[in-house]
Amino acid sequence: VVIFERKLSIGGGMWGGGMMFNKIVIQKESKRILDELGVKVKEYKEGYYLANSIEAVTGLTFQAVKRGLKIFNLISVEDVMLRKERVAGIVINWSSVLHVDPLSIGSKVVVDATGHSCELARLIEKKVGSYLKTESGGVMGEKPMWAEVGEKTIVDNTKEIYAGLYVAGMAANAVFGGPRMGPIFGGMLLSGEKVARMISERLEKGDLD
């Protein structure tokens, strides 16, 4: 499993918590994920917990790398590879030097976890047309902030949107027209867990060979 991170640091917007107060909120449903990875949480009120955003990012990263994840930072994805109407990889380049010819990376599955911009989904829409598995066939666009709804829909919206391409995290809500949530990250954790499980199950069955 490989993550290509455009920026120098990984973790998206989690570092800053809510408006740079370095605290994030998670619900009881996702608390077990942070517990498993050794990230401390403190109960705020029934059903809601607080975690230090710095500890959460670094803890998640450390444990993921320790378990085999490869991370390449300062690399942008500028295109996708398509073979027989299926995403078969991505096209990458250095984030700081985009005027040189890129490299292609083949993959059995690609996950668009580019956040609010859902960049890979938009690339498919631009290059192939409105063939995404959404109501419109295209990117529906992120709706205004509504944390309660967004936290539920982000897990439901985590799925395959084009053959070989899944969406997770805020990219999922952006593609399917779900609302944004602010500094509450329980749904994000559950979304990541769900997409990993879905892909693992298909790999075990040999569906992606």
Model region roles, listed by residue range:
Residues 1-29, 37-45, 49-209:
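Residues forming the flavin
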Residues 33:
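Core catalytic machinery and nucleic-acid-binding channels of phosphodiester-processing enzymes
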